[in-house]
């Protein structure tokens, strides 16, 4: 059975925050932020918008694109590090709002790698034969856990969501190869502080890890798929920092024009990062049926995940 994406949707909140905003209260500048990160702006949700709201807006688009009804969904997996509350899960909340029926639901916490983890998990359930359509969502409201007094992190993060309906696809399409991994010894480099409830990051250590693992994991899944870098039509890395992305691209041996870049518009949106980038390329007509994509993410944990997928239903 070939398992892939049958429907796609994405959502970014309406509030656009440019770099000049931070010049009002932090010792920084648009020039510095752009040069060091590649970020020009990011979208932030309203205070009364929850992660489940972002997830819902992306999900209804994915279900419609798949040509099915909510009742046809057999399971919901949400990748998020910023649930509305500790429990119930965002997936539980989505199940009720979408009207899917009393299906299995779970949130998956792998930070910025979460969308990769969740797609790979859904693939296994579908291949087991027990589930036909699984809704996979990557959604985060990072603005609520960002320390606005910390210049090194305040400028980096945005809010958003992306969703896919996964199921059986045509011969030759779908997920070809994948990899997931973690290194708990690096957990201290990127975490949510218990006392403040805000994100903390050792930028230097995360940068070193990300450059190495994004390039290496991408190379391994391409080789596992029996392909070479020349066979890749689009490289979609986690949109954390343009310098990390460029380094990973170079390690993989992909031309610059084959790398998706949306970090300038959305910043780092964690689990929503890769689907938001895919959405941009779909809108720009850069993804066509039977194109081969490499998706790769890294995140707190430290975690990583990579997928080679042949696009098309």
From Swiss-Prot:
It holds the Pfam family ACP_syn_III. The active site is at 112, 238, 268. The keyword Lipid biosynthesis applies. Its EC number is 2.3.1.180. It catalyses: malonyl-[ACP] + acetyl-CoA + H(+) = 3-oxobutanoyl-[ACP] + CO2 + CoA. Its main location: cytoplasm. It is an enzyme of class 2 (transferase). One of its GO terms (biological process) is fatty acid biosynthetic process. Residues 239-243 are annotated as: ACP-binding. One of its GO terms (molecular function) is beta-ketoacyl-acyl-carrier-protein synthase III activity. The last Arg residue of the ACP-binding site is essential for the weak association between ACP/AcpP and FabH. Homodimer. PANTHER family: 3-OXOACYL-[ACYL-CARRIER-PROTEIN] SYNTHASE, BETA-KETOACYL-[ACYL-CARRIER-PROTEIN] SYNTHASE III, CHLOROPLASTIC. Belongs to the thiolase-like superfamily. FabH family. This is Beta-ketoacyl-[acyl-carrier-protein] synthase III. It comes from Staphylococcus epidermidis (strain ATCC 35984 / DSM 28319 / BCRC 17069 / CCUG 31568 / BM 3577 / RP62A).
């Amino acid at each position: 059975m070939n398992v892939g994406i049958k429907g796609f949707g994405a959502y970014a909140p309406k509030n656009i925050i440019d770099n000049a905003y931070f010049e009002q209260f932090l010792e920084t500048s648009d020039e510095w932020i752009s040069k060091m990160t590649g970020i020009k702006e990011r979208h932030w949700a309203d205070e009364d918008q929850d992660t489940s709201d972002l997830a819902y807006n992306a999900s209804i688009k994915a279900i419609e694109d798949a040509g099915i009804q909510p009742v046809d969904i057999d399971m919901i997996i949400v990748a998020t590090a910023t649930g509305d509350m500790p429990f119930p899960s965002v997936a539980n909340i989505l199940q009720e709002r979408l009207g899917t029926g009393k299906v299995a639901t779970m949130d998956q916490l792998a930070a910025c790698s979460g969308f990769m983890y969740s797609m790979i998990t859904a693939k296994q359930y579908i291949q087991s034969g027990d589930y036909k359509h699984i809704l996979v969502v990557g959604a985060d409201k990072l603005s609520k856990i960002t320390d606005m007094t910390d210049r090194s992190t305040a400028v980096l993060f945005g809010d958003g969501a992306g969703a896919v309906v996964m199921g059986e696809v045509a011969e030759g399409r779908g997920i070809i190869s994948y990899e997931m991994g973690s290194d708990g010894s690096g957990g201290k480099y990127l975490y949510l502080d218990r006392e403040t409830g805000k994100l903390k990051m050792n930028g230097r250590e995360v940068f070193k890890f990300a450059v190495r693992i994004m390039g290496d994991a991408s190379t391994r899944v391409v080789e596992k798929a029996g392909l070479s870098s020349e066979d890749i039509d689009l490289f979609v890395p986690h949109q954390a920092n343009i310098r990390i992305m460029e380094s990973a691209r170079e390690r993989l041996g992909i031309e610059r024009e084959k790398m998706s870049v949306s970090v300038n518009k959305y910043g780092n949106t964690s689990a929503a990062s890769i689907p938001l980038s895919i959405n941009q390329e779909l809108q720009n007509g850069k993804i066509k049926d039977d194109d081969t994509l490499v998706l790769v993410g890294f995140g707190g944990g430290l975690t990583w995940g990579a997928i080679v997928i042949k696009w098309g239903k």
